[in-house]
UniProtKB/Swiss-Prot annotation:
Intracellular or extracellular location(s): Membrane
Cysteines paired by S-S bonds: none
Listed name of the protein: Uncharacterized protein MPN_407
Organismal lineage: Bacteria, Bacillati, Mycoplasmatota, Mycoplasmoidales, Mycoplasmoidaceae
GO cellular component terms, A-Z: membrane
Xref: Pfam families: Lipase_GDSL_2
Presence of the UniProt keyword NAD in the record: no
CDD domains: SGNH_hydrolase (cd00229)
Keyword annotations of the record: Membrane, Transmembrane, Transmembrane helix
Entries under PANTHER family matching the protein: SGNH HYDROLASE-TYPE ESTERASE DOMAIN-CONTAINING PROTEIN, THIOESTERASE 1/PROTEASE 1/LYSOPHOSPHOLIPASE L1
Length: 879
C-alpha cells in the first residue's frame, strides 16, 4: 500500500465537484484519493473551518483544475534545476581573437506585498528572508560543482598564450571572472498594499525597464488574500505575469517561482490564504495543462504546509506578536526553506543556527550604560548617545543647569568671545573658528551645553552633551564624530541656537571661561541628490563594488545596500525604490570593465549609482600586475560608461576605506584616494559625481572609539581591532561598519537620517577583549562519535547568573579542519543548545571540526570606568 498523502489545502469539496455529486460518491472519491499520489490535493482539512459561501461562489465558475498531486508540483521547474543551478555552464564568445566567458544570469526579482518589506521595528536592521536567501545563494558552496573546481577563478590565461604567470599577463587582456555563485543579483520590488493586478500592470515600467531578471519570484500576499471578490482578476493577472516572464509559450529561457504564504496564528486569515494559495497553484496547473513547457519553467515553494516546514511553526518563535508577520527567526526559516527547495539536489541544508542573529533586547538606559568601545556587532539594538559623564537624570534634586554653571563659574575669567561657531548644514558639522592666534600654542578644552532656560531636561536628556575638543592656533580637533553632536544638539531651523561654550586652558591658568555664544546657521543651497530624487515616485539604485559592498563580514546581518533599502522604505517613505547590489567579492576595475555587460550595462534607468572599487586594485598593484595609471584609466572609463548609459543619474563615488588587506600598501592607498577625491572637483564629473568620504568617516569613527589617530595610523592594528567596525581579521567591514557605510551614503545623498530609526542602530558582540581576570568553571564538552550529538554540561556559579545588569550569551564556533570554514552559533543560555543540538548532529558527524565554546558577560560600566567589565572568553577547545 502506498503511503497516505497528507492533504494540505481545503475547499468545500461538495460545492467544488458540483452539486450533482452525491455525498456517497464524494466519499468514494475521497477514500480512493487517500491511496494515490494523483488524488485531488485540495480537500477539506479537518483542522480548518470550511470556507465561506462567498469563496465557493467566486472560485467555482473559474473551472480551475483540482487534480494536482504533490508529486506533480515537485516535478515542476526542472529546467530551473539544470540551467540556473548549473553554475559552471558558460558559453564561450570569441572576442578579439580570444574567448570571453559569459556567465549565466542568476538574477532574481522578488515581488509581492508588505511581507517583503523589512520593517525596522520588527527586525531592527537584520535581514529578511529575501536577504537570507541572497546570502545562501552568493556565499554558500554547491556540492554539485564539478570535482576539482575552485570557488573562484581570478585569472584565466590568454587564449593560445604561452604566458604562465599573473605578472606575465597584461591585465587588460586577462580573462577574469568570478565564481558564478557570487553573480546572483537580487532585487526586491515588493511594497505594502501591492496586489497581483498592480504587479502585472506595472511589470514593464517597474521591472523590465530596469533589467530583465532571469527568475521572477511572487509571494502570495495579504493584499491579495483579503480581496475575496478578486479571484478571476487574480487568475488573469497571474497568468499574464507568468507569460511576460517566461514567454507566451514558455519559450524564454527565464523562470517563475511561486511562493505560497506561510501559515499564521490567525485562523480567519489562514482561510483566506488557503483559498488564494489554491487559486495560484491551480492557475499554474491550468497553464501546464495547456502547454507542458510551462511545467519546466515554474517552481513552487510551499511555506504554508510543505514537508520542510518545521512541525512547531505555529507554536515556535517564528511569528511576531501580530500573529501574522515573521519574527527574526521566521525570516531566517523562510530563507532556509527557499534555499532547500531551490538548491541543487543533494546540497547540504544550511545549519539552522549558522547565521541566525539573536536580537533579544538588552535594557540599555542610564542605569545600565555600557561601554561601546568593548561591545559591538551582534544583534542588539541600542541607543548610541554618548554621555561622557554619568548623570543621574532620575534624581529629583539634580539640576543640570545648576551643576554646569557651578563648575563653570568656579574660576571664571571674563573675556570677550574670540570664537565663531557655525553649523554647516550640508556636512552637518560644527565649524569653530578663532579670531585670535595663540602665540604660545596653548591648548583649550571645549565643552558645549544647551541653554536650558526653556527646556525640561527629563523630557529631552539627549539635548545635553559634553564633548571635548582641542584648539591650537585657530584650529580645532573635535574628538567626537559629528553625528553624535548633531543628534544631541538636534539643531533645527525653527529652534533657538543659543548655546554655552565652556573653555578650559590646559596650562591651568584661567581655568574656566564661560561664553554665552550663538551658533550661526549656514544656509546651503547647493542642489543635492536628494533634491533630484524627491519628485521621483520610484528611484533605482545600483551598487557596484567589491567585498566591502558585497557584504562579506556581516555574518547574516544586513549589508550596507540592504540597510539602505530598509531605510528608504521605512524612514523616508520611498517604498517603491529599488536597490540592486551587483558588488562581487574580489572585484576590481578591470574585472568590472571586462564583465560590464553582466555587471552594470544590463541595468537601465538607474538614478543613483554607488561605486566603491579600489581595494583589490591596490593589492594587485602591489603584486606588480598593473599600474596606478591603469587604475585611473579604468575608473574614469567606468564613470564615462555609467554616465553614457544613464545621463540623468548621479554617482556616489567612494574613496577607499582602511583594511588589514592594505596594511603593506599604505602609500598606494593614499595615492588612490587622492585621485578619487579629486574626481568630483573635475569639471568633467562635478555635475554628477559626489564623493563618499570613507577615509574621513573612519578617522572620525576612530575618535569616537577613543583612539587618537591620524590618516597615517589608520592601518594601525590597535585601530582595526578596537574601533569595532571591522570583521574577518579586520579585512572587511563588520555589521557596524556596514551601518556606518549606509549612514554615510544617506548623508552624501542629502537625507536627514538623524531622527530616523537608523540613527541609533548598533550591535553588540566581541570586541577587543582583555583576558578575563576571573576564572570560571569550565563546561564539559563532548561529541558522540556515533550520532554527532554535541553535549555541553556546565554548573554556572551563582554570581554569573543573568541579571538586569548583564547577560551571558554563549558562542559556539565550529572550524572545519579541512578548509577552515567557520560557523558560529549564538545562544542566549547554555540550555538553549538542547533544543538545537540534534539539528547539528548529521552536520557534525560528517565533518572534522574544532569546537570553541565562549561565554561573555557584560556588567554595568561607564565610559570612564572600563575596568568594571568582566569578560569570559575561551572556555574549552575540543577537536
Amino acid at each position: 500500500m502506498k503511503k497516505r498523502t497528507k492533504y494540505r489545502y481545503w475547499l468545500n469539496s461538495l460545492a467544488f465537484f458540483g452539486c450533482g455529486v452525491s455525498v456517497g460518491a464524494f466519499f468514494t472519491l475521497f477514500l480512493m484519493g487517500t491511496q494515490s499520489d494523483v488524488s485531488p490535493l485540495f480537500v477539506k482539512n479537518i483542522n480548518i473551518q470550511l470556507p465561506s459561501s462567498t469563496h465557493q461562489q467566486k472560485i467555482e465558475p473559474l473551472n480551475l483544475p483540482t487534480n494536482i498531486s504533490k508529486t506533480e508540483i515537485a516535478s515542476w521547474g526542472s529546467e530551473f534545476q539544470s540551467k540556473v543551478l548549473d553554475f559552471y555552464a558558460r558559453d564561450g564568445e570569441e572576442h578579439d581573437n580570444k574567448i570571453r566567458y559569459q556567465l549565466p544570469s542568476l538574477s532574481f526579482a522578488w515581488t509581492g506585498g508588505k511581507e517583503l518589506v523589512s520593517d525596522f521595528a520588527r527586525l531592527h536592521g537584520a535581514r529578511n528572508f529575501v536577504a537570507y536567501f541572497d546570502q545562501y545563494w552568493r556565499f554558500w558552496s554547491n556540492p554539485n560543482w564539478p570535482a576539482g573546481q575552485v570557488d573562484r577563478v581570478d585569472v584565466l590565461c590568454e587564449w593560445n598564450s604561452d604566458k604562465q604567470t599573473i605578472s606575465d599577463i597584461n591585465f587588460s587582456d586577462q580573462f577574469v571572472f568570478a565564481s558564478a555563485r557570487f553573480e546572483g543579483k537580487i532585487a526586491n520590488f515588493g511594497f505594502a498594499g501591492q496586489t497581483m493586478k498592480d504587479i502585472n500592470e506595472s511589470f514593464q515600467e517597474r521591472v523590465l525597464s530596469i533589467y530583465k531578471p532571469r527568475t521572477l519570484v511572487y509571494l502570495t500576499s495579504q493584499a491579495d488574500a483579503e480581496r475575496v471578490d478578486y479571484y478571476e482578476e487574480f487568475v488573469n493577472n497571474l497568468t499574464a505575469l507568468i507569460k511576460k516572464q517566461v514567454g507566451e509559450k514558455a519559450e524564454k529561457d527565464n523562470f517563475f517561482i511561486l511562493q505560497l504564504h506561510w501559515k499564521t496564528n490567525d485562523s480567519a486569515f489562514n482561510e483566506k490564504l488557503s483559498v488564494l494559495n489554491f487559486v495560484a497553484l491551480a492557475t499554474v496547473k491550468q497553464l501546464t495543462d495547456q502547454n507542458r513547457n510551462f511545467a519546466s519553467k515554474i517552481k513552487v515553494v510551499d511555506h504554508f504546509e510543505g514537508d520542510f516546514v518545521p512541525s512547531d511553526w505555529l507554536s515556535g518563535n517564528y511569528l511576531s506578536e501580530d500573529k501574522v508577520s515573521l519574527s527574526l527567526q521566521g525570516e531566517f526559516a523562510i530563507g532556509k526553506q527557499l534555499a532547500q527547495v531551490l538548491k541543487a539536489t543533494g546540497a547540504e541544508p544550511l545549519p539552522v543556527e549558522v547565521t541566525e542573529p539573536s536580537l533579544e533586547a538588552i535594557p540599555i538606559n542610564e542605569e545600565t550604560q555600557f561601554d561601546v568601545k568593548n561591545y559591538y556587532s551582534f544583534g542588539h539594538y541600542h541607543d548610541t548617545n554618548v554621555i561622557n559623564d554619568r548623570i543621574d537624570f532620575d534624581d529629583p534634586n539634580y539640576n543640570l543647569e545648576t551643576d554646569f554653571f557651578n563648575n563653570a563659574k568656579a574660576n571664571l575669567v571674563t573675556t570677550s568671545n574670540p570664537f565663531t561657531v557655525t553649523w554647516k548644514t550640508k556636512t552637518k558639522e560644527l565649524e569653530i573658528e578663532s579670531t585670535e592666534v595663540n602665540p604660545n600654542g596653548l591648548q583649550y578644552q571645549l565643552s558645549f551645553a544647551s541653554d536650558f532656560n526653556a527646556r525640561d531636561i527629563k523630557k529631552r536628556p539627549t539635548s545635553y552633551l559634553r564633548w571635548n575638543g582641542t584648539i591650537t592656533n585657530k584650529q580645532i580637533d573635535i574628538s567626537l564624530y559629528w553625528k553624535y553632536i548633531h543628534k544631541a544638539l538636534d539643531i533645527k531651523e525653527n529652534e533657538p541656537l543659543n548655546y554655552l561654550l565652556q573653555i578650559t586652558r590646559t596650562d591651568g591658568q584661567g581655568s574656566y571661561q564661560v561664553i554665552n555664544g550663538w551658533i550661526n546657521k549656514e544656509k546651503d543651497n547647493t542642489p543635492t541628490i536628494f533634491d533630484f530624487l524627491k519628485d521621483k515616485t520610484q528611484a533605482n539604485w545600483l551598487f557596484i563594488g567589491d567585498s566591502m559592498t558585497h557584504g562579506v563580514g556581516t555574518d547574516g546581518y544586513s549589508s550596507a545596500p540592504q540597510l539602505l533599502e530598509q531605510s528608504l522604505k521605512n524612514d523616508f517613505g520611498r517604498y517603491r525604490d529599488v536597490v540592486i547590489n551587483s558588488a562581487i567579492n574580489g572585484s576590481n576595475t578591470s574585472l568590472e570593465l571586462y564583465m560590464q555587460n553582466h555587471r552594470f550595462k544590463q541595468y537601465k534607468n538607474i538614478d543613483v549609482y554607488v561605486l566603491n572599487l579600489g581595494t583589490n586594485d591596490i593589492n594587485q598593484l602591489a603584486q606588480g600586475v598593473y599600474t596606478v595609471e591603469q587604475y585611473k584609466h579604468n575608473l574614469t572609463q567606468i564613470l564615462d560608461l555609467l554616465h553614457t548609459q544613464s545621463p540623468q543619474a548621479h554617482v556616489v563615488l567612494a574613496n577607499i576605506a582602511p583594511s588589514s588587506l592594505l596594511r603593506s600598501s599604505e602609500k598606494n592607498w593614499k595615492t588612490f584616494n587622492d585621485f578619487l577625491e579629486g574626481i568630483p572637483k573635475d569639471s568633467n564629473y562635478s555635475s554628477f559625481v559626489h564623493l563618499l568620504d570613507q577615509k574621513s568617516l573612519f578617522l572620525q569613527l576612530a575618535k569616537v572609539s577613543g583612539i587618537d589617530i591620524n590618516e597615517n595610523k589608520l592601518f594601525n592594528t590597535d585601530f582595526l581591532k578596537k574601533s569595532f567596525y571591522f570583521a574577518d581579521k579586520f579585512s572587511h567591514l563588520s555589521v557596524n561598519g556596514n551601518v556606518e557605510y549606509m549612514r554615510n551614503i544617506l548623508t552624501t545623498v542629502g537625507f536627514d537620517w538623524q531622527n530616523s530609526a537608523f540613527a541609533s542602530l548598533g550591535y553588540l558582540s566581541f570586541g577587543y577583549l582583555k583576558k578575563p581576570a576571573t576564572v570560571v568553571e569550565l563546561p564539559e564538552v563532548t561529541v558522540d562519535d556515533q550520532t554527532g550529538v554535541l553535549d555541553i554540561k556546565q554548573s554556572v556559579p551563582p554570581k554569573l547568573k543573568v541579571n538586569k545588569q548583564g547577560f551571558e550569551p554563549v558562542f559556539i564556533t565550529f572550524t572545519n579542519t579541512n578548509n577552515n570554514e567557520q560557523v558560529t552559533v549564538v545562544l542566549n543560555n547554555w540550555s538553549q543548545w538542547e533544543t538545537h543540538k540534534t539539528d547539528f548532529a548529521p552536520w557534525l558527524k560528517c565533518k572534522h571540526w574544532n569546537i570553541d565554546v565562549k561565554q561573555i558577560r557584560r556588567v554595568k560600566t561607564t565610559f570612564r570606568d572600563q575596568e568594571n567589565a568582566n569578560f569570559f572568553e575561551l572556555i574549552e577547545s575540543k577537536q
